[in-house]
Each structure stands twice: as structure tokens, then as C-alpha cells.
């Protein structure tokens, strides 16, 4: 068999495998969409749950999810970006740097339920925040932290060293170079990674199960020390352990579809924002 034929066979094998992945994705999306699209309405997005979660809407769960996402990003974004800058720009290639990277990768691989238990032990019990938005946001922020660190590192690695050397040649300090030259160029990829990490955080159930999520609340939270409803936990409860699981099946599929659409919108937003910021950097 000639080398050309082998390459064609390998090409078609990889193409079929890629198509297989896409088919699985479309099958999952089709499964959720067909069963959940009829639930999407203005009332579904703006009303409180009613009649044992079988009627009404998911408004408090949407608001709670947005609160938790915003709070977690307030924790993960500044800490993760600063840590990524320090690791890549300020530490030499030494055992210490490799150790930090190893620990960051290990932190990213820890199961989310372990983060939930840690958050419950530290934020809920030891720091006495109780089941609250603060405890949930801090826990989710720690969960997203290694992702933001790695994204920042990769964005900085992608910047050619000639820009750094040129800045130093003009008399700029290390801090000025990072702040005025490197960080603006890396920001499109950093923001993209941040938005994608929001998609992961918004779908986590285990961490909020131990730190903030409530089965049902009659009103929206008025303080960061209140509990909230959240979409992933809401979906889990009405699908497995609610009082009327069979009757709330349509509500569950509708909630799942909202979560999928939320992540899809975040991905589209990430791509659009990366292109916009990239063009802005090129123009400057």
C-alpha cells in the first residue's frame, strides 16, 4: 500500500471520528430541544415556580445563577489573571515555577464535589457565612481559578518576545511592559477564556449543593448572605428528588434547554468579543 493511500485512509478515519463527535453533540441538543422548546415563553423566564415546581417559571433560578456567576468571576478573574502574569512574566524557569504549574493543573483536576465540601467546611461553617451567595461565589471562584490561570498563561505565551524586547529597548520597566504592551495584546484570549469558564461555572451543581442552593424560595435574595435558587440545582431537584418528579418532567427539559442556550450564547459571545478585541489591538 502506497504512502498516499495510507494518508487518505488516515484522513478519512479522522474525518469520520470528527463527524461522530458532532453527531453525538447534535443528538444531545436535539434530544433536549425537542422536549424543552415548548416550555420557552415569557412566563417561563419571568414567573416564580408554582404547584410543586410543575408550573410557573424559573425566574429565581435564573437570577440566582447570574448572581453566582458574577460573584465567582469577581473572585477568579483578578486572582487568576495576576497569578498567570506572575507565573509567566516574573518567575524564572525553575523548580518553583514547575511546581506552581503542577499544583495548578492538579487543582483543575479536582472533582467539583470536593470543592463543594471544602467550601462548606471553610466558608459555610468555619467563616460562618452560612449557606449564602458569598459562600457559593467563593467556592465557584476557586473552582474557576485554575482555568483562568492557565488561560492567562497561554495568552501570554502566545505573545512574541520581540514585543517585550522592543519595550525594554525603549526604556520601559517590566511593569510598564506588562501593563502597556503585553496585557492589552493578550486580553482578547484572556477574556475569551474567562467567558468560557463562566459556562463551566454556571452548570456546576455539586459546589452550590453544599454552599448556597435552595430547593425553593418564595422571594428573590436581598443580601449576599441569603440563599438562592440556581438552574443546575433546580434541574437536579425536579428531575430526581422533587415531590412531583413525573409531573415536572417538562419543566426539567425546559430548564436544561435554558442552560444549554446560556452556554451556547456565551460561546458565541466569546468568539465575537475575541474578534472585536483582536481587531482593536491590531488597529492600535
Functional labels for PLM-detected ranges:
Residues 1-18, 270-284:
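Transmembrane alpha-helical segments of polytopic membrane transport and secretion proteins
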Residues 3, 72-104, 117, 125, ...:
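Transmembrane-helix boundary motif in ABC transporter permease subunits
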Residues 52-56, 208-260:
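Interhelical loop and adjacent transmembrane-helix boundary motif
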Residues 56-86, 194:
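Transmembrane alpha-helix signature in integral membrane proteins
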Residues 73, 174-212:
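Transmembrane alpha-helices
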Residues 79, 92-96, 164-192:
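Amphipathic cytosolic juxtamembrane alpha-helices at the membrane-cytosol interface
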Residues 105-142:
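Generic hydrophobic transmembrane alpha-helix motif, especially the helices
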Residues 153-157, 161, 168, 195, ...:
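C-terminal transmembrane helix and the adjacent membrane-cytosol boundary/short C-terminal tail
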Amino acid at each position: 500500500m502506497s504512502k498516499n493511500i495510507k494518508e487518505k485512509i488516515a484522513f478519512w478515519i479522522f474525518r469520520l471520528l470528527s463527524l461522530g463527535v458532532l453527531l453525538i453533540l447534535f443528538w444531545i441538543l436535539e434530544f433536549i430541544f425537542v422536549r424543552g422548546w415548548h416550555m420557552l415563553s415569557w412566563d417561563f423566564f419571568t414567573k416564580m415556580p408554582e404547584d410543586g415546581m410543575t408550573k410557573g417559571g424559573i425566574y429565581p433560578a435564573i437570577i440566582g445563577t447570574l448572581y453566582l456567576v458574577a460573584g465567582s468571576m469577581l473572585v477568579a478573574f483578578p486572582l487568576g489573571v495576576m497569578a498567570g502574569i506572575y507565573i509567566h512574566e516574573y518567575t524564572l524557569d525553575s523548580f518553583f515555577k514547575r511546581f506552581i504549574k503542577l499544583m495548578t493543573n492538579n487543582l483543575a483536576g479536582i472533582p467539583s464535589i470536593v470543592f463543594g465540601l471544602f467550601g462548606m467546611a471553610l466558608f459555610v461553617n468555619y467563616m460562618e457565612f452560612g449557606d449564602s451567595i458569598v459562600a457559593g461565589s467563593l467556592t465557584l471562584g476557586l473552582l474557576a481559578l485554575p482555568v483562568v490561570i492557565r488561560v492567562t498563561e497561554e495568552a501570554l505565551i502566545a505573545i512574541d518576545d520581540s514585543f517585550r524586547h522592543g519595550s525594554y529597548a525603549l526604556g520601559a520597566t517590566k511593569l510598564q511592559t506588562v501593563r502597556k504592551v503585553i496585557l492589552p495584546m493578550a486580553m482578547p484570549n484572556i477574556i475569551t477564556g474567562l467567558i468560557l469558564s463562566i459556562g463551566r461555572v454556571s452548570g456546576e451543581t455539586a459546589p452550590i449543593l453544599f454552599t448556597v442552593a435552595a430547593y425553593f424560595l418564595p422571594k428573590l435574595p436581598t443580601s449576599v448572605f441569603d440563599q438562592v435558587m440556581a438552574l443546575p440545582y433546580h434541574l437536579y431537584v425536579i428531575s430526581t428528588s422533587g415531590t412531583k418528579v413525573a409531573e415536572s418532567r417538562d419543566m426539567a427539559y425546559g430548564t436544561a434547554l435554558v442552560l444549554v442556550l446560556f452556554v451556547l450564547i456565551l460561546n458565541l459571545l466569546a468568539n465575537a468579543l475575541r474578534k472585536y478585541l483582536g481587531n482593536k489591538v491590531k488597529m492600535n
